[in-house]
Amino acid sequence: RKRKSFPCRLEIIWIIKVAPTCGIVNTEDYIDGEDEPRCFYNPLRTTAKLVWFAKGYLEYRFPNAGIQNGRVRRLELSAELCSEAPDYNMEWPSDITLWINQREAGTWTCPSDFGGRRGKLNPDWWEDKNTQYGKLKVWTLEENGTYLDGKKVNDVSVTDYCLADGPFISVRIGVKEDAKHQGGVNLFGNSFGDYPQDIVMRILYE
């Protein structure tokens, strides 16, 4: 069996559909200010380390070269996430959904836009009143179903996601338009929050 690991930096955004409150920061400053979706098209987004939006989704694309002639046994995707409120709010739930190749892979109801203490990695200029950290969530696609943090969420097999069929693997993170808790998303890169990682995909295949 072989393993592939693909870290995907936050700035490599392919499809954007977001609404305020929203924004992007890098390790130095805000990119184009806050609450302006146009900032997601600024060339400086290539330095993004934290992105947030109240509604909508972002889509990332991962390579699938090398698995076309094999059998994928497992896909694991991990990211640090939380809800998005103005500043931060410990009572702000959000139903955050992951889609893989346009197929739903499970929803996590985040309880909070976390704050009250500084994120372990946050730069000094990031104000205490802002979102500080998230939770590291892990989605796993197995042959017998899909799991979130080790708990089975549906019976969709890893083969049902058709990972090798297209030229890439689509990963979409967002909040459904009809979600019960429409509390937005904060998505942390390797220089904000508590975990020194970007979005990471791991594939086990043979």
Question: Which role does the model predict for each range below?
Answer:
Residues 174-206:
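Proprotein-processing/basic-patch segments
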Residues 73-77, 157-159, 165-178:
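Short, well-structured beta-strand segments within conserved domains
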Residues 1, 72-75, 136, 197-203:
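Generic hydrophobic, helix-prone segments enriched in Leu/Val/Ile
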Residues 30, 41, 57-60, 88, ...:
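Sequence-level detector for tyrosine residue identity
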Residues 39-52, 110-164, 181:
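Extended, solvent-exposed segments with strong compositional bias
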Residues 3-123, 127:
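Mid-protein regulatory/catalytic core that forms ligand/cofactor-binding pockets
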Residues 98, 169-173, 201:
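Hydrophobic beta-strand residues in large extracellular and virion-surface proteins
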